[in-house]
Amino acid sequence: MPKAEVILWQYLKGKKINGCKFRRQFGVGPYVVDFYCAEFKLAVELDGDSHFSEDAQKHDIERQEYIEQFGIKFLRFTNKDVYTNVNGVMQTIYEAIV
C-alpha cells in the first residue's frame, strides 16, 4: 500500500468518522477503489503521480463514471493532499457523510 494510503487509513479505520466503516481496496465491478464506506456509498481514491498523464486521466474519468452509476459518491485526492493537509482531506470526507 502506498505511503499516502497508509496515512489516510490510520485516520479512516475503526469507524472514526461518524461511525462509518471504511474498507480498503474494495471492488466495484471490474474496478477497485482505495477506500469504501458501504453505509454512505462513498468511495475515496488517492491519486499518485501516475494518474496525471492524459491517458491515465481518461481512464480515471471512465472508471469514476462507471462507479457513480451505482449511486456511489466519489471523492478524489492526491497523495500530496494527504501529505500536506490530511485534516482538510478528513474534513471533506466527513462533510460527504453527514
Task: Tell me what each language-model feature is.
Residues 1-98:
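Nucleic-acid endo/exonuclease domains
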